[in-house]
């Protein structure tokens, strides 16, 4: 019995030690460093309104349906963050074709003056997460005519807004130019007031 107890004692001590180190000490150190070095990212890259209320995150897309605003990518999960993911249909899957055709039909209703051949792919396909907050500058530009017509904001002003909100590739190498739809719409909202 004493031999069994001598084997169990170090196992229990090591388990408890690693439980405290990995479950308490390490997360606290990492959180502390993140809060000190990159507080905005550590807090979720939140976006606040003029009243200092959280209205979203620059990392998670939102569903904009009002025709006065720029619209983001299609989301198969309706932008519900707790259900992140998409259907990830294969290109040969007929359901993908139906979903894309439905997106194109909705596009044509909202933007009748823009030929379907000019619709960027990111406006009719969803991202892998279904929560993509960004669209391409071209995807924003093809919406200018609709927004200008409804809001009476000159196209030049809207195009300048897109240009100002366009972010380049990460480190100049990774990814493509992109526009955060929430941030773009917040700037547009200032013009609508």
Swiss-Prot record:
The keyword Transmembrane helix applies. InterPro entries: KdpC. Keywords: ATP-binding, Cell membrane, Ion transport, Membrane, Nucleotide-binding, Potassium, Potassium transport, Transmembrane, Transmembrane helix, Transport. The chain crosses the membrane at residues 14-34. It is a single-pass membrane protein. The keyword Repeat does not apply. GO terms for molecular function: ATP binding; P-type potassium transmembrane transporter activity. The system is composed of three essential subunits: KdpA, KdpB and KdpC. Belongs to the KdpC family. This is Potassium-transporting ATPase KdpC subunit. The lineage of its organism: Bacteria, Bacillati, Bacillota, Bacilli, Bacillales.
